[in-house]
Swiss-Prot record:
It catalyses: (2S)-2-hydroxy-3-oxobutyl phosphate + 5-amino-6-(D-ribitylamino)uracil = 6,7-dimethyl-8-(1-D-ribityl)lumazine + phosphate + 2 H2O + H(+). This is 6,7-dimethyl-8-ribityllumazine synthase. It comes from the Bacteria. GO terms for cellular component: cytosol; riboflavin synthase complex. GO terms for molecular function: 6,7-dimethyl-8-ribityllumazine synthase activity.
Amino acid sequence: MFGADKGTADKLDGKKLHIGIVQARFNENITNTLAAACRAELLRLGVQEKHIRHVLVPGALEVPVALQAMAERDEYDALIALGCIIRGETYHFELVANESGAGVTRLALDYQVPIANAIITTENLEQALARQTEKGVDAARVAVEMANLLEELS
């Protein structure tokens, strides 16, 4: 059964899971809130604090590099990408959004590890502020659900 508002299942159990989080520092006021909401939800779902590894990188383009290092260690049941890209006046927004997203997806497929992508992309700061908590919670829920699903399928 899926939640009425979101695509994640209602009952999730993270008790046995090891989760890696990579957080971009760029737009740190937003990404810190994303990370806090994500961590709180992981703990609420039963993931043990000692089984959560959280690292920081400069920006969204560096997130896939750290995710790859974590995926190569084969210690994590799921990974989470956290970042915030706000549109500016140049093409840089599209470049960073597209490349970071493609990198995250490629890693999930190449390493067969679920990666919840919460690198939020918005037109302005107001949109980012409105999404920061919800998207952090969503990322935690997606990571736990997908880790459990892949375990069930293996």
